[in-house]
Each structure stands twice: as C-alpha cells, then as structure tokens.
From Swiss-Prot:
The modification Phosphoserine is found at S5, S8. This is Glutamate--cysteine ligase catalytic subunit. GO terms for cellular component: cytosol; glutamate-cysteine ligase complex; mitochondrion. Catalyzes the ATP-dependent ligation of L-glutamate and L-cysteine and participates in the first and rate-limiting step in glutathione biosynthesis. One of its GO terms (biological process) is response to heat. It comes from Mus musculus (Mouse). Belongs to the glutamate--cysteine ligase type 3 family. GO terms for molecular function: ADP binding; ATP binding; glutamate binding; glutamate-cysteine ligase activity; magnesium ion binding; protein-containing complex binding. Heterodimer of a catalytic heavy chain and a regulatory light chain. It holds the Pfam family GCS. Signal peptide: none annotated. It catalyses: L-cysteine + L-glutamate + ATP = gamma-L-glutamyl-L-cysteine + ADP + phosphate + H(+); (2S)-2-aminobutanoate + L-glutamate + ATP = gamma-L-glutamyl-(2S)-2-aminobutanoate + ADP + phosphate + H(+). The modification N-acetylmethionine is found at M1. Feedback inhibition by glutathione.
Length: 637
C-alpha cells in the first residue's frame, strides 16, 4: 500500500509544519526523475498482479469465523522462508492495512510472451499454498473483498473492544486499533486523516431493504454525538479508515515501452475501470448488514477522505487553499495523452505555482496539470529520519504525495537510479474467491492492453461520463442492470497513435454521438450493429498470435468466465453471496448477517477456493474437480 518508510512518525502538527517542504522537494524529486528518464524506451511490456488476502480463523464448535490478527507474524515467516533466503523466490509478500491482511505478488514481473499468461494462476496457487502452510489449525487464507461482519462485536481473534477515545488512531465505535497493521505508517495515516479532516471519517452505505428490514432503518448512537449527527436513516454507518482500507482488492501494474505509451494506456484503461469494477463486484455486506451496493469503491473513498469542511464546500475558505471535489481515493480527474485532452471536461483543481514551475522545466501542460493536481494534497505521514533527502537520488517526498492519491489508475514514474520503465497501475478490481477467477480478470485486463496497443484502439469519452459510470458500477447488480457510457467507434483507422493523434481527431470538441449508453453485455460480448464487443476483439487478436495450445486453452477459459459474467449466465461474487445469504435457513429477511450466517458463508467461500466443492453458478459447470483437499481449516482434516 504505497511507501513504507521505517522510523519515527511525526505528530500531525509537526507533519503539517513540513507540508510545504515535502511538496517542494517532492516536485524537485519528480523533475530529477523526469529529466533523467523521459526518453527511456523499454522493449518489453512487463507486468505483474497484486492480490490482497485476509487471514481467518474458524471456530467450528460455535460456528463462528473471525479475522486473525497475526498478519505481521505470517508475513515475517513468509519473507524469511522466501525472498530473504532466495532473491529469485517466485513470490513476494508485503504488509497491508489490516493486521489480518497480507499482500502477495509474483517474485519477478511477467514478460511479453503469450505463454506467460499460463503461469499466472500457477503462481497465485503457489502464493495461496505458501501462506496457508504457515497458518495454524482451523485457520485459512481467504481472497474476500469485504469481511461481512467487519466492525461487529468480537470480529477479531484475539477479540478487542474498540476504543472511541481521543488517544487512539481510529477513535472508532466499531473498529479496534489492534486490527490495524502495527507498522507505524498505518496507524499514523489513520490518526492524521482524522486530525486533518477535523472529525472522524463518515461512511454511509444504503441498506438493502428486505421484507423484514425495519423502515426506516435507524441506528442510534446516544454515547457518541459525532456518530449521531453523521449517521443517516436507511444507511449502514461506519466511522473508520479500516472499513475501507481493511478490504481486499486485485491490482495489475504494467510497464510501458515509453512515457508516451504509458500515458496512452493510462487514459484508455481509465475508461475501462468502471466496467471491470462492475464485472468483479464482490462486496455487498458491511458491518453485519446486507447493503444495497455491490462494490467497495465508495466505502474506501469515504474511509480516507481527509478533506476539511472548507475543502468540501461546507464552509467558506479561510484556513485552506482549495475547494476539492473528491476524496484522495477516487477516480482520475484528467487524461494524460494528447488524444485525451479534448475529453478533459472535469474542473481540475491545481496548485498553480507548482504547475508554472513544471511548465518552466519543460513539462507539457497535460502532465504538469496532473502532477499539480496530485500536489494539492498534504502529506499524511512523515518520518523524522526522512525529512531531509537527496533530491537527485531519492523520491520519498514525491512518493509521499503520489502514493496517498489512491485513484482508479496510477501513473508511476520509475524509481530513481533503477532500470525500471514508466508504469501504469490498474486499481478498481475487487478480489475474487478463487485463483482461477483472479487469474481470469488479470489476464483479461493484460490482454486488453496488448490489443489496445496493437490495434491502436480508442476508448476515450468525456471524463465526466467515466465518473458517471463509476457511480453506476457500484450499484447492486450493475453488471446486469447498469447502463454505461461507452465509445461506439473504437477502431478509427488507427487514429490513436501513441505519440499523438492524426488529423481525423483534431476537432476541439468531442461529439456527443461518439459515445452512447450500453449494457456491460454489449460492451464485453458485442451487439450486432451497435458494438463489436471486447471479447470478440480479443479473440481475433489471439487468432493472429502464435500461442501454444495449452496457453490458448487457459486464456479461452478465462475469457469464457468474463463473457458469462457479463451476459448474466454466471453470477458475480456479490450476486452469489447475496443468494447464499437469502437462502440460508437462519436468515430472517431482515438484512442482518449473524455470526452463524457469516460462518457458513466464509466456510463455503473457503471450500470453493480450495476446490473442495463446485460452484457452477459462480464458475460454470464442469469447473475443475478438487485438486487438493484437507486444508488446515477443515474440521475433518
């Protein structure tokens, strides 16, 4: 989760005192990197995935499942057995926000050959097996986006009570600080977001109104005036960073051949973010209730919203410099490529001084405004040992701001003094239950980048429409019911060349008829006379590539999953979870997920992930039979 400096974190007051210093030197660090590597060309498209995991413990006797707060120990063991012993170890492990979470990536990035698509799932399996092997009895590693009873009494092992007093990090009524990773960055981030904002974060998720759900659904918090004021009727109220950053996701990073190719990919993939988010929907439950959303995006956005009342437009600007329209965790606000410029229709708040400085240094308008927009934010954490840095050889101040702008896409300059290229990160996906599904989504997105670059595809639409798509994508059953703005003609005779656009696209105003509302089924699978469909385009690309039979078979299985999820033939994880709860004998049709129901659901998820049972409605019939059995969590093992 971004920069992980070691050392002594400064208080919020001290961090604030150094904010201008961090911004000033962050820009100098960016300029050093930019001038050193702006002409760097890489031959190979490298890429890698990141999977976030939750550690859980099953109490089979009392039919209860809890989040296991030993991520630190598990991580230490995995790193000791892996990368510290062998620098070429096939997996890498990193800490995540929750003390019940870990993040796993392949040890080396994948390269440009088609056969590498066949190694993704094997590597994910290796990660799952490796981490599971260091767990105790009745413990399991799960790829679940949101734990349904996160924030309910006794949801952690060991159990801890929340401490809503000022001294803590979260001050939450529901989320104990012990559930936050012990690395000083995470607790400090949590505390400083709250201090900067001037109050606790506020998350209100609409409740799903079932037959017996009270109407209006109202929770009262007599002991907490802040919560009483912030919570809304018919909404599930949450008050801590952990409710967002304590969820798991699936991300992919690509190294492009050049800075211009990275900027082009950044823009093209930004329009794909809401589509893939809806396709990967996997988080319908929050704080023990069934919600009316299927994706975590808005929850995580609110969970780290450090904007003050002035910045949110609730009070006149007095102490702050800017009105800021979005949380630091949200969709992108500007395209970076020349082709994207005319579609930049969102008002962009920028630091004008930084913008002018970047222009003077020879950086073009589009990249300058992107960086000047990121740098309207304050640093949220600062370590005493990391204040004075060598700007020519270090980038911690730049990364401090860059890595706490959590957007749908991230444009990543190379680290100083490395041979890494310009990268983009694709960030909106929800993690799936199985390695097969996670591989399918990763391979789909990576293949799409290949096709975008090979066929010079153009998905650009006004950025305000992408934002509208993001709102639709989070709704319940968006994959089947949502309509999304999408470009009609994506193959304009190879207009979208990487280093600029041809004359055919030079009109300054995007035409409204360039895009229209489509269903995800149309976007993914195509509709005659309307849109060719992304999967048919991927298939035609594959037909023209040299691909061995085995790899082709794997890729086609992955694309079949995406195709069937888009058409509704297979369920999303979110829909499947909703059906599971609705059909549970203990469910009272009141939108409440009890310990017993939660246990049944997570146990079932674990069995599906370990391939101990089939789930045709999620994965298709005839999906692989059990490959291995008797995981450590199994009561009969």
């Amino acid at each position: 989760m971004g920069l992980l400096s070691q050392g002594s974190p400064l208080s919020w007051e001290e961090t604030q005192r150094h904010a201008d210093h961090v911004r000033r030197h962050g820009i100098l660090q960016f300029l050093h990197i930019y001038h050193a590597v702006k002409d760097r060309h890489k031959d190979v498209l490298k890429w890698g995935d990141e999977v976030e995991y939750m550690l859980v413990s099953f109490d089979h006797e009392n039919r209860k499942v809890q989040l296991l707060l030993n991520g630190g120990d598990v991580l230490e063991t995995l790193q000791e057995k892996g990368e510290r012993t062998n620098p070429n170890h096939p997996t890498l492990w990193r800490p995540e926000y929750g003390s019940y979470m870990i993040e796993g990536t392949p040890g080396q990035p994948y390269g440009g050959t088609m056969s590498e698509f066949n190694t993704v799932e094997a590597n994910m399996r290796k990660r799952r097996k490796e981490a599971t092997s260091v767990l105790g009895e009745h413990q399991a590693l799960c790829t679940i986006t949101s734990f349904p009873r996160l924030g309910c009494p006794g949801f952690t092992l060991p159990e801890h009570r929340p401490n809503p007093e000022e001294g803590g990090a979260s001050k939450s009524l529901f989320f104990p600080d012990e559930a936050i990773n012990k690395h000083p960055r995470f607790g400090t981030l949590t505390r400083n977001i709250r201090h900067r904002r001037g109050e606790k974060v506020v998350i209100n998720v609409p409740i799903f109104k079932d037959k017996n759900t009270p109407s209006p659904f109202v929770e009262t918090f007599p002991e907490d005036a802040e919560a009483s004021k912030a919570s809304q009727p018919d909404h599930i109220y949450m008050d801590a960073m952990g409710f967002g950053m304590g969820n798991c996701c699936l991300q992919v990073t690509f190294q492009a051949c050049s800075i211009s190719e990275a900027r082009y990919l950044y823009d093209q993939l930004a329009t794909i973010c809401p589509i893939v988010m809806a396709l990967s929907a996997a988080s319908p439950f929050y704080r023990g209730y069934v919600s009316d959303i299927d994706c975590r995006w808005g929850v995580i956005s609110a969970s780290v919203d450090d904007r003050t009342r002035e910045e949110r437009g609730l009070e006149p600007l007095k102490n702050n410099r800017f009105r800021i329209s979005k949380s630091r965790y949200d969709s992108i606000d500007s395209y970076l490529s020349k082709c994207g410029e005319k579609y930049n229709d969102i008002d962009l708040t920028i630091d004008k001084e930084i913008y002018e400085q970047l222009l003077e240094e020879g950086i073009d308008h589009l990249l300058a405004q992107h960086v000047a927009h990121l740098f309207i934010r304050d640093p949220l954490t600062l370590f005493e040992e990391k204040i004075h840095l060598d700007d020519a050889n270090e980038s911690d101040h730049f990364e401090n701001i860059q890595s706490t702008n959590w957007q749908t896409m991230r444009f990543k300059p190379p680290p100083p003094n490395s041979d890494i290229g310009w990268r983009v990160e694709f960030r909106p996906m929800e993690v799936q239950l199985t390695d097969f599904e996670n591989s399918a989504y990763v391979v789909f997105v990576v293949l799409l980048t290949r096709v975008i670059l090979s066929y010079k595809l153009d998905f650009l639409i006004p950025l305000s429409k992408v934002d509208e798509n993001m709102k639709v994508a989070q709704k319940r059953d968006a994959v089947l019911q949502g309509m999304f703005y999408f470009r009609k003609d994506i193959c304009k005779g190879g207009n979208a060349v990487v280093d600029g656009c041809s004359k055919a696209q030079s009109s300054s105003e995007p035409a409204a008829e360039e895009y229209t509302l489509m269903s995800i089924d149309t976007i993914i699978n195509g509709k005659e006379g309307v849109f060719p469909g992304l999967i048919p385009i991927l298939n035609s690309y594959l037909e023209n590539m040299e691909v061995d039979v085995d790899t082709r078979c794997s890729i086609l299985n992955y694309l079949k999953l995406i195709k069937k999820r888009a058409s509704g033939e297979l369920m999303t994880v979110a829909r499947w979870m909703r059906e599971f709860i609705a059909n549970h004998p203990d469910y009272k049709q009141d939108s409440v997920i009890t310990d017993e129901i939660n246990y049944s659901l997570i146990w079932k998820c674990n069995q599906i992930a370990d391939e101990l049972c089939e789930c045709p409605e999620l994965l298709g019939s005839g999906f692989r039979k059990a490959k291995y059995s008797g995981g450590k969590s199994d009561p009969s093992a």
